[in-house]
Amino acid sequence: MKIQLVRWHCSRNALWNRAFYSTRKATKNASSATPATMTSMVSQRQDLFMTDPLSPGSMFFLPNGAKIFNKLIEFMKLQQKFKFGFNEVVTPLIYKKTLWEKSGHWENYADDMFKVETTDEEKEEYGLKPMNCPGHCLIFGKKDRSYNELPLRFSDFSPLHRNEASGALSGLTRLRKFHQDDGHIFCTPSQVKSEIFNSLKLIDIVYNKIFPFVKGGSGAESNYFINFSTRPDHFIGDLKVWNHAEQVLKEILEESGKPWKLNPGDGAFYGPKLDIMVTDHLRKTHQVATIQLDFQLPERFDLKFKDQDNSYKRPIMIHRATFGSIERFMALLIDSNEGRWPFWLNPYQAVIIPVNTKNVQQLDMCTALQKKLRNELEADDMEPVPLNDWHFNVDLDIRNEPVGYRIKSAILKNYSYLIIVGDEEVQLQKYNIRERDNRKSFEKLTMSQIWEKFIELEKNYK
């Protein structure tokens, strides 16, 4: 921790306060913490999530954690729908055993599934879904399909359950109940390459543009590297088909010019895959995104489409997720930023602090700004909140504590902006606003200027 005197120019008599803050370079204890420990530390400080032994391996997202979780999903839905042509579906959490037998999961993945038995006379066995692909196959096969519908892209954000061993559970990185930005593409052989390249483009947007993770390797231009995972010992389907699928992925990798290495025997039981790997601050690697090429499930579900020559042909299925587990992605973000969220993702976007909590003019000016930025309606107002409007996470600290204490508290919580209101601000009708990462520079802005500034930050993912 550092302690320094900060002069807040917020009244005619300048106010001096001690400011306590974490330096950007972590302390020795923080820098040696595992991602799970770092996640727990930040969560406690920012009230992000909790766990309970009554539901091991499941996460309770508290309001601040839910804001981050939902914002990540909102971001991904926008990219998938309006940039890459996905249509979102919502599918059941539980299916009969017969579905999992058909897909091959019951034979190859049963140990990792939660099984449920009904209490009726039939005592039929069900399974909680560990992945969405069989459900998406049911949607594709529900009606006749034509070649001009392809590529057909489904996305799904519903929760998944996997029966991880209790000893393997670890914070947000290894859970029994989690969410993925899951998606499946049904396409023709001639469309496979362009669809996989588009999946890699979205991965580049996420890992090289929006979220600056630790570099994926020594001197790497990309923040990630790719593991090319090939046929495992236990697999379904024909060996010749597997060899063809692996050759297709290898050619795409070589053409992409991206860093990759062979990971023999670690493919999915239904097809080879490209696993996107990032490193945490301890240089340990974690799988996040994945792209999988599958010739097997379309065969097992007898999926087909009518081609231009009126013959029926089998589509190829591409499984892909960009965040991978959203919970794990959040853990790696925390490991990378230590709770210093970018403004658009921050549950603590701004805090408004009056110098004198007894001063009516200062309080009025503070509450007016908070109401404007939060953009909330009163409960007795019969008008609904408009869709697609801006709402910022802005708090007002009017605790009966010295202003220096409240400033220190805001800094420790990593608010993106501190907005101070004193006598001078009341006189000028401008707010004293300071960025989290710039402790020496202040701006005097009007309410409308702050509103426009925050909109620009969110629009540009800053």
From Swiss-Prot:
EC assignment: 6.1.1.3
Molecular functions (GO terms): ATP binding; threonine-tRNA ligase activity
GO BP terms, alphabetized: mitochondrial threonyl-tRNA aminoacylation
Cytoplasm keyword on record: no
Main enzyme class: ligase
Catalytic reactions on record: tRNA(Thr) + L-threonine + ATP = L-threonyl-tRNA(Thr) + AMP + diphosphate + H(+)
Protein name, per record: Threonine--tRNA ligase, mitochondrial
